[in-house]
Amino acid sequence: MEILLDEPINLEQVADLCAIGMKRKPPTPRNYSLWHVSNLLQSGHLIAKGDIRYHEFEGAPYGIMSWGRIFESAIDCYLTHYAVNLGGFYTPDVESIKDDILGSLDGMMWLPDLGWLVCETKLRFTLNGEIPLSHLQQIRAYCHLAETDIVCYVSGHITSRPPVAEARMRIVKLTEQSIHETWQGIVSTKECLIGHGCCPIGNAV
């Protein structure tokens, strides 16, 4: 993995851009009849512990999940502005499917110097700036779907003690091997689940 850019995001600028806003369609409701990248990654961790099932969240979203969506919407405004300033463009809420597995990308960006980038935004309640392995696995899978090896990873960090709110944007180039191995692991997880009679809840009989 090669870090091409690592810089802080001015949250006051983000707030100003949110005030201007951006016109967009609401995201497509989640299709529970399909296999999803994020669910299969979670299922892989469960299988490693001997719990063979397809991981799906059921019920009303937690408030913390809603805050994550709010942060993503704010960063969409920032990434749109960032891309246009560099002669490119940003498209939020992109879906891609391969091997009957759906990935719901936070967005895709095109920049003249780099081409296509997968964009992923995370809100974290820690100041730890390392990219977690679970996030890396997710963006590797999305890179496979988008047929690129470059990622724009934005992380928001909030803590109460001390009270801190900050955000960083990193542009990272992943290795083709890591992308391929991650996707093969996801496909293997799906095949394992099918072999044990598991399926998405939308396909349950």
Segments predicted by a language model, with ranges:
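Nucleic-acid nuclease catalytic cores
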Residues: M65, V84-I194, C198-P200
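Charged, glycine-rich intrinsically disordered N-terminal tails and low-complexity linkers that flank
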Residues: M1-Y78, Y82
